[in-house]
Amino acid sequence: MIELKYLSKTFQMKDGAVKALQNINLTIPDGAIYGIIGMSGAGKSTLVRCINLLERPTEGSVVIDGTAMETLNAAQLRERRRDITMIFQQFNLLMQRTCLKNVCFPMELAGVKKAEAEKRAMELLEMVGDALKAVGMYEFREHAPHLLSGGQKQRIAIARALATNPKVLLCDEATSALDPNTTHSILTLIKDINRKLGITVVVITHQMSVVEEICDSVAILDGGVVVEQGSVQEIFANPKTAAAKRLVAPNGGSAARDLSCFAPDDHVVRVTFNGSSTAKPLVASLAAEKGILVSVLSADTRDLSGQCYGSMLLKLPAELAVAQQAVEYMRSQSGVTVEEVTGI
């Protein structure tokens, strides 16, 4: 288990102190795939570097399996870091080494014999192959990394990260440099590794689609502060903070923030659907049963762990009484949440 307790990080700059992280409290269970999401500058990369103490927290504690990491001496910390590996946006492969030797590298540092290291590296290269294309990465074992595609490089990086049998895999924007299809294949691989090996995965990203596809739970970071956390389904169904709404419903969220796009007497609401309620023809039912017509400004649906979730931004009639009646009707429907954006 990973526990971040009252963690803060301050950088001393020429112009003064910069608070990158403030009072972070998170618990990540063993075997989970946990997302940490935020816009650029939110403090995501600083936070993930604090987990393995590449950055030492200014205040607070990082506790992994009951051990406060900041209390370890240099030798103890090096030993514990073998249990915590990391993959990056730019892969960080050693270009002067072949793919096989890249995977062997952390085992060399750990003193593993060459024959044993190469045997495990070959097994890992097979494991991270692209099942959809029936391509085992061992076929590229003698290739230099510059001959590989971005997705292939990331597969080699994942194999290298698994070389020391880690308990935790940190993914820092690991798919942000990849195209959508390759992103999906890499996320599928990470999910398979999590399921087969039981490795705890921490995913740092600015892409809600990544969290949606792979994560069990998520924390939303904004300005160095965790503003919201919970299950992915919970956050998608009912985002409470402005930061969460920007990430979960970027179209509806941006329209809702720009109040200048609405007239003073406009009545606009955000409607979210949870699970089976997405199949209900809410707008049509509102018109048929109440005779109230509304305009759909934006709409979106997502499938999360087999459950369908959706959201709509609706413009209601100008008459206040009619708009209020529409809100009351929608709120009476099971699995439907209505948030007033403006004008009611």
Where does each model-flagged region fall?
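C-terminal boundary and immediately downstream tail of ABC-type ATPase nucleotide-binding domains
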Residues: 237-266, 270, 290-293
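Conserved H-loop
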Residues: 198-204
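ABC ATPase "signature
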Residues: 229-230, 238
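Hydrophobic patch in the ABC ATPase nucleotide-binding domain
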Residues: 112, 137, 199, 244, ...
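ABC family nucleotide-binding domain
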Residues: 1-188, 192-193
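A short, surface-exposed alpha-helical micro-motif characterized by mixed small hydrophobic
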Residues: 211-213
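Non-catalytic connector elements of ABC transporters
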Residues: 263-344
